[in-house]
């Protein structure tokens, strides 16, 4: 579940796609995973507080698994840590807020085109 939490992490991107170099596939994956986590949370299957203490090792494993280049892994890890830390909500809206943060920080710029 933590994999989806991090990968989803960018849900309601409203900016003009021409202004941001994020891959549409990446945005869609983040959006869909955030939406599914929100539904699972509302159904009681996911606890949003569970993800507050994700370790650097878990972040590294996830970035490697999805194909983030070695030179971008620390940048992506920093975005993930910052977004999780800045969200104060402890309810199911947390997933949407983290997604918004990821999109603002253009996390998809660091993911491969063929996610």
Curated annotation (Swiss-Prot):
Disulfide bonds join 26-108, 41-92, 83-101. It comes from the Eukaryota. Its main location: secreted. Residues 1-22 form the signal peptide. InterPro entries: PBP_GOBP_sf. The keyword Isomerase does not apply. Salivary gland (at protein level). One of its GO terms (cellular component) is extracellular region. Gene3D superfamilies: Pheromone/general odorant binding protein domain (1.10.238.20). It is found in: Secreted. Coiled coil: none annotated. Salivary protein that inhibits the classical pathway of complement system activation in the host while having no inhibitory effect on the alternative or lectin pathways. Prevent cleavage of host C4 and consequently impairs the activation of factors downstream of C4b in the complement cascade. May form multimers. This is Salivary anti-complement protein.
